[in-house]
């Protein structure tokens, strides 16, 4: 079974070596249980810091996107090196390169591909290209909520929803500026819909329980394509 794991840039913002150790062991557990795994990394605070500085001196959005892409690739290299023998030792810079790397049978780790495209969209694209029917989005909350649980306290997790439900929740909260993408952007949603890819949103602090989460035995949100 093929699976793509999208790791939020916030995972790297914590500067926590234990996060990387748990990620490595979780990927090893997945591969030992017959999963083919691809990983897409976000840019996190490294991307935002460079984008902020560049924007303040008047650099255009396309170039800001490039800074974000290279930050996400730096995180991809960190994950790739930490996986050691599990990973194919190349970070692809395009969908074509991902497909070629995927053919070698090892874990492929990538960051962004091109300006104007979030790493969530990249994750959806590589899920489609690898015939993965599940895309796992690992972020710093347990799943999808009606409102941001990091801001509001009176919110409940939505365990099951459709991509149409997600659109309504995200309506008005998405930005197309470099460094501001959250969860799934409209392009990512369209891709998972056209290829009928199930999305599981989980907390990256629970990666050690990812198999249980995939079985629906742990807290997460499952987004079904419509």
UniProtKB/Swiss-Prot annotation:
Sorted UniProt keywords: ATP-binding, Cytoplasm, Kinase, Nucleotide-binding, Pyrimidine biosynthesis, Transferase
Pathway entry: Pyrimidine metabolism; CTP biosynthesis via de novo pathway; UDP from UMP (UMPK route): step 1/1
One function term, GO molecular function aspect: ATP binding
GO biological process: 'de novo' CTP biosynthetic process; UDP biosynthetic process
Gene Ontology cellular-component annotations: cytoplasm
Listed EC numbers: 2.7.4.22
Localisation: Cytoplasm
Binding site for UMP: 43, 65, 113-119
Control of this protein's activity: Inhibited by UTP.
Reaction(s) catalysed (UniProt annotation): UMP + ATP = UDP + ADP
Keyword Iron in record: no
Pfam families: AA_kinase
Residues that coordinate or bind ATP: 6-10, 44, 48, 139-140, 145, 148
Family indicated by similarity: Belongs to the UMP kinase family.
NCBIfam families: pyrH_arch (TIGR02076)
Function in brief: Catalyzes the reversible phosphorylation of UMP to UDP.
Assembly information from the UniProt record: Homohexamer.
Name of the protein described by the UniProt record: Uridylate kinase
Organism for this UniProt entry: Saccharolobus islandicus (strain L.S.2.15 / Lassen #1)
Gene: pyrH
